[in-house]
Swiss-Prot record:
Taxonomic lineage of the native organism: Eukaryota, Metazoa, Chordata, Craniata, Vertebrata
UniProt effect for mutating residue 170 to F: Abolishes activation of Wnt signaling
Subcellular location: Cell membrane; Golgi apparatus, trans-Golgi network membrane
LRR repeat feature ranges: 67-90, 91-112, 115-136, 139-160, 163-184, 187-208, 211-232, 235-256, 258-279, 282-303, 306-328, 329-350, 353-374, 375-396, 399-420, 423-446
Principal subcellular localization: membrane
Residues carrying covalently attached carbohydrate according to the record: 63, 77, 208, 500, 792
Self-association state and partner proteins as the record states: Identified in a complex composed of RNF43, LGR5 and RSPO1. Also interacts with other R-spondin ligands, including RSPO2, RSPO3 and RSPO4.
UniProt-recorded name of the protein: Leucine-rich repeat-containing G-protein coupled receptor 5
Length: 907
């Protein structure tokens, strides 16, 4: 008689007594058999579950109940098992010894376990399968030997395991298939040999496993298969050969007539032959992506009526769409990363049941009509070369829910291309060439992506998308129709609609509100009100508007607006006045005057930039969102940004040159040396202009973009390239201010005490010092802003940053000429000379007036000339032309006490 049956028969009296006796087994025998520190609980009326896991045990507990059906000894320190350690556990069905330190299991270790069905020995240190310990466990159904160090499987180790259904041998060190050991496992249904070091599968390796349904061989080193290696696997439905080193298509699968799921992705297979799956008509799913496939036979996937999923990723050499005749039940088709340039017009006739189509990362240029694919729910065509979407491309796809057309070259979409897609909720058209967007038939969209279409600058009304939840637009201004600003505006209008009505109307509205509130419950009223508010804020739109992407006004706040207008007016008028007095004056232009005139000219460009921004703000007042994208991408914004940076940098460079010129002039005058030629100064001015042009051209060359914001200025935050550019500008300007400070400090220190009054009373020296001080002070907040952004200091609000960029940065452009006009006497002299010259020019245009009294006119002319020319014993160094420089008998740096002199001959 079978020993297992004998054990059960011997235990029947005890079971009958427990079942019919008055005392409860839970309170009697069962609980008395629970080892110390273990957790025990009843398993039905007569059996016990014992959990002794993770207790640090080094040996098996000895006082186990005979009625134990489940014993968990995993995660302990058990290193060995003695023969017959659990002799009385005839009812034990599951034994867990995982996560211990077992290196060897002796014969008889599981003797007496007649009912054992599940044995877990994973995560130990076994180097081979126990030769005799597992034999004759006739009830065993599941055996786990994974995550050990097994490199050898004895031929007879599984003999007697007639009930074994599941065998885990994965994550070991096997180098070959243990063919002899598997011959006794005729009832085996699932086996995994994954994560080993198997190189080859010989013929008839699984010849006696006729009941095997699932076989996992992934993550090995298999490079070859015997042509008959799968013979005998008549019931196999799942075969996993993924992540191996196969070089050729596994033609041995043709004998697997019941195969339903096949995976051999991530190998080195380069071709799939014609009629590759002719012997596998039951295939439902095939995964063979991430293979360097160069050739696929056109008939490779024909006549697979049960195939539901076909996935081929990374087949970079496929140029033709496969012929899928007879594979009419395909539901999911993925062919990505290939070079397919066209689709057959009959693709939907072959695949009428297709639900998911993924042809991303191909070279498709033109699309056929998918109208026959009535069951399509998802289409992914991103990263192709599609140029146009015709009216019939997606016509009558009533089940289509997701359509991805991103990263193509789509420039034309027929107005009714999406008009017959009632189920469409997700549409991705990002990174195309769209300049317009059709809205017909898209009222059910919940997700819409249009980002990257830089030519799409028009606003899209939120009323056309009542169900929309997430939208991505090319420009932040287009989110104003969906954002908080617009919602708040609507709410404000609703609450303020009756502000101008009469008191009687207000009382009527209040009465109506309270009457409606009385007619229904107050809580329902409040809930409805909250839902209305949430509905207004339900759409998530990106990129979101903000201070640098405004919805209504380019210059938010009247403080900034008035500041920009003031700077524009003062910079234009004052710099124009200074430039006119310097360059149109009949008096001789000294080097320092030339520099002041050039500085005024470049400062005028800053005034032009501020004036243009103020004009754009006025033109788009209250509706900047309608024009924001046009302004950012227009030539005007880039020109204004270029002029702003050029003018700012030129002003700093020229001011540095002026400070150095003053220092050199004092040095040469003190040493009775000849000054540098006037032409050299002009060359240096030209070099400063070229350097400023170079700095201003960097954003146009890709370092950053002037059109990144409507302010047309590189912002001191955001992309690293933009931040680096701004920091470079600040460092360069700081270096210039340092040079100016050193030059003037050296000038002061090198003067004798008696010369101080003469030098510091000179108007031009003091004027440059004043410019140095004001410009340096105004440069500090800009420098602080740039460096704080560099180290991620976020305590500065965007409004403050905007004020600094629009008001503080261009402020020197209007202060520089004002300081010259108000505090420099040379301006008054030049202005008087200009007025006299203008007067003479005007009189010369009217000869009748000149002939009234010619004698008086001649006398006035001579008097004027004599008034301009003053002979003195002091020599003038810089206010005379080079040809009239006298000998330096009395060297003076500049005309500190005398006016500028010009020699004009008397008429």
């Amino acid at each position: 008689m079978d020993t297992s049956r004998l054990g059960v028969l011997l235990s029947l009296p005890v079971l009958l007594q427990l079942a019919t006796g008055g005392s409860s087994p839970r309170s009697g025998v069962l609980l008395r058999g629970c080892p110390t520190h273990c957790h025990c609980e009843p398993d039905g009326r007569m059996l016990l579950r014992v959990d002794c896991s993770d207790l640090g045990l080094s040996e098996l507990p000895s006082n186990l109940s005979v009625f134990t059906s489940y014993l968990d000894l995993s995660m302990n320190n058990i290193s060995q098992l003695l023969p017959n350690p659990l002799p009385s556990l005839r009812f034990l069905e599951e034994l867990r010894l995982a996560g211990n330190a077992l290196t060897y299991i002796p014969k008889g270790a599981f003797t007496g376990l007649y009912s054992l069905k599940v044995l877990m020995l994973q995560n130990n240190q076994l180097r081979h399968v126990p030769t005799e310990a597992l034999q004759n466990l006739r009830s065993l159904q599941s055996l786990r030997l994974d995550a050990n160090h097994i490199s050898y499987v004895p031929p007879s180790c599984f003999s007697g395991l007639h009930s074994l259904r599941h065998l885990w041998l994965d994550d070991n060190a096997l180098t070959e298939i243990p063919v002899q050991a598997f011959r006794s496992l005729s009832a085996l249904q699932a086996m995994t040999l994954a994560l080993n070091k198997i190189h080859h599968i010989p013929d008839y390796a699984f010849g006696n496993l006729s009941s095997l349904v699932v076989l996992h061989l992934h993550n090995n080193r298999i490079h070859s298969l015997g042509k008959k290696c799968f013979d005998g696997l008549h019931s196999l439905e799942t075969l996993d050969l993924n992540y191996n080193n196969l070089d050729e298509f596994p033609t041995a699968i043709r004998t697997l007539s019941n195969l339903k799921e096949l995976g051999f992705h991530s190998n080195n297979i380069r071709s799939i032959p014609e009629k590759a799956f002719v012997g596998n008509p039951s295939l439902i799913t095939i995964h063979f992506y991430d293979n360097p496939i160069q050739f696929v036979g056109r008939s490779a996937f024909q006549h697979l009526p049960e195939l539901r999923t076909l996935t081929l990723n990374g087949a970079s050499q496929i140029t033709e769409f496969p012929d899928l005749t007879g594979t009419a039940n395909l539901e999911s088709l993925t062919l990505t990363g290939a070079q397919i340039s066209s689709l057959p017009q009959t693709v939907c006739n072959q695949l009428p049941n297709l639900q998911v189509l993924d042809l991303s990362y191909n070279l498709l240029e033109d699309l056929p009509s998918f109208s026959v694919c009535q069951k399509l729910q998802k289409i992914d065509l991103r990263h192709n070369e599609i140029y146009e979407i015709k009216v019939d491309t997606f016509q009558q796809l009533l089940s289509l829910r997701s359509l991805n057309l991103a990263w193509n070259k789509i420039a034309i979409i027929h107005p009714n291309a999406f008009s017959t897609l009632p189920s469409l909720i997700k549409l991705d058209l990002s990174s195309n060439l769209l300049s317009s967007f059709p809205i017909t038939g898209l009222h059910g969209l919940t997700h819409l992506k249009l980002t990257g279409n830089h030519a799409l600058q028009s606003l899209i009304s939120s009323e056309n998308f009542p169900e929309l939840k997430v939208i991505e637009m090319p420009y932040a201004y287009q989110c104003c129709a969906f954002g908080v600003c617009e919602n708040a505006y609507k709410i404000s209008n609703q609450w303020n609609k009756g502000d101008n009505s009469s008191m009687d109307d207000l009382h009527k509205k209040d009465a109506g509100m309270f009457q409606a509130q009385d007619e229904r419950d107050l809580e329902d009223f409040l809930l409805d009100f909250e839902e209305d508010l949430k509905a207004l804020h339900s759409v998530q739109c990106s990129p979101s508007p903000g201070p640098f992407k405004p919805c209504e006004h380019l210059l938010d706040g009247w403080l900034i607006r008035i500041g920009v207008w003031t700077i524009a007016v003062l910079a234009l008028t004052c710099n124009a006045l200074v430039t006119s007095t310097v360059f149109r004056s009949p008096l001789y232009i000294s080097p320092i005057k030339l520099l002041i005139g050039v500085i005024a000219a470049v400062n005028m460009l800053t005034g032009v930039s501020s004036a243009v921004l103020a004009g754009v703000d006025a033109f788009t007042f209250g509706s900047f969102a309608r024009h924001g994208a046009w302004w950012e991408n227009g030539v005007g914004c880039h020109v204004i940004g270029f002029l702003s940076i050029f003018a700012s940098e030129s002003s700093v460079f020229l001011l540095t040159l002026a400070a150095l010129e003053r220092g050199f002039s004092v040095k040469y005058s003190a040493k009775f040396e000849t000054k540098a030629p006037f032409s050299s100064l002009k060359v240096i001015i030209l070099l400063c202009a070229l350097l400023a042009l170079t700095m201003a051209a960097v954003p146009l060359l890709g370092g950053s973009k002037y059109g990144a914001s409507p302010l047309c200025l590189p912002l001191p935050f955001g992309e690293p390239s933009t931040m680096g550019y701004m920091v470079a500008l600040i460092l360069l300007n700081s270096l210039c201010f340092l040079m100016m400070t050193i030059a003037y400090t050296k000038l002061y220190c090198n003067l004798d005490k008696g010369d101080l009054e003469n030098i510091w009373d000179c108007s031009m020296v003091k004027h440059i010092a004043l410019l140095l001080f004001t410009n340096c002070i105004l440069n500090c907040p800009v420098a602080f802003l740039s460096f704080s952004s560099l180290i991620n200091l976020t305590f500065i609000s965007p409004e403050v940053i905007k004020f600094i960029l629009l008001v503080v940065v261009p402020l020197p452009a209007c202060l520089n000429p004002l300081l010259y006009i108000l505090f420099n006497p040379h301006f008054k002299e030049d202005l008087v000379s200009l007025r006299k010259q203008t007067y003479v020019w005007t009189r010369s245009k009217h000869p009748s007036l000149m002939s009234i009294n010619s004698d008086d006119v001649e006398k006035q002319s001579c008097d004027s000339t004599q008034a301009l020319v003053t002979f003195t014993s002091s020599s003038i160094t810089y206010d005379l032309p080079p040809s009239s420089v006298p000998s330096p008998a009395y060297p003076v740096t500049e005309s500190c006490h005398l006016s500028s002199v010009a020699f004009v001959p008397c008429l």
